[in-house]
């Protein structure tokens, strides 16, 4: 603050009074007063819930590793690179590995995701932006119902209803594009339904209903503003709806991938077992992590046999964590780009 010059007094100059200094106000994120007992209890409960979730995840991983180590110590093969038949009956010389399980799990999940997400995007945009209200409501209910159907129903439907209908398409793809490894003849007849092709389509149906609500949350004011500026309906969707729902679409895609990675009952019913190595063909059979463990559930009375399958479960657990971490990173990156 600058003091006025005494020489200016009486000289006809207007002297402004000095402005008072603004007081510094500290802001307490928990309020201006001391947190009460109820506030402290709520904070402890919230922190405890977060710690409990982390502790449960760590406990699951530790349990799986603890049960798997004895079996891994008796394994005569490289657990990560062996893809042959599992031999766990002789616990003194066990042979098991996850290479084939990992390949089948990732392949069928990515195939299902590639089929499901474009369809899910189209369904979501149609229901939220184009369909009349009297039609959008019932259709949205039917789409959401896809996520509520039990897996065993999908499995039976896929094997006995969908697979016979896919036989002509499978035969045509094999005949026309059989030179490509993706459509080459697999480990069994192409016209049988127990293949990755059938299982992936069933998985795609199961994970379709993951993005509809994301696009339904777009501000209607933004859409109306775009239309008022002369944009067509598609231009409004492209400039407002799609950018708004991009992050949710990415996270929904990874959520669908996570569900596909862990799907058990439907694929256990559909996929045929095989003793051949996985050839990366859509017309191969095989086992995923989940179906391998579920199929051997009745033989897990021995700690070493159980340990072999729990080791596979540990790998599936870690794979799921990695996928979720990638989803989180992609979601954060997409939001930053959008901003």
Task: Mark where each language-model region is.
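C-terminal transmembrane helix and the adjacent membrane-cytosol boundary/short C-terminal tail
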Residues: 212-223, 227, 254, 295-339
